[in-house]
Swiss-Prot record:
GO cellular component: cytosol; small ribosomal subunit
Name of the protein in question: Small ribosomal subunit protein bS20
Entry keywords, A to Z: Ribonucleoprotein, Ribosomal protein, RNA-binding, rRNA-binding
Function: Binds directly to 16S ribosomal RNA.
GO terms (BP aspect): translation
Protein family (similarity comment): Belongs to the bacterial ribosomal protein bS20 family.
């Protein structure tokens, strides 16, 4: 345990920030999982695109808040869009 007053405050502040960051991370990870589950359940194109838009916004917000690094945000979005685009291509080929 810290003895110095400023060190005690740093402990309080860092714990508060850790919990806030954890909430942002959980939020965007859940949005990504929703998209992947929609793809797995073969949801319609509109539903998948709407969920993808929400996931992208959640990732961007986490990046802007400094919860994750901008490169990690870009990588997560790229991998998500790769899966979404692959799913949309399979939808188009099955409709033809």
């Amino acid at each position: 345990m810290p003895n110095i007053k400023s060190a005690k405050k740093r402990v309080r502040v860092s714990e508060k920030r850790r919990l806030r960051n954890k909430a942002y991370k959980t939020f965007f990870k859940n949005r990504i999982k929703e998209v992947l589950k929609a793809i797995e359940n073969k949801e319609p194109k509109e539903v998948v695109l709407e969920l993808t838009r929400k996931a992208q916004a959640a990732i961007d917000k986490a990046v802007s808040k400094g919860v994750i690094h901008k490169n990690q945000g870009a990588r997560r979005k790229a991998r998500l869009f790769e899966k979404v685009n692959e799913y949309l291509r399979t939808l188009e080929t099955t409709q033809e």
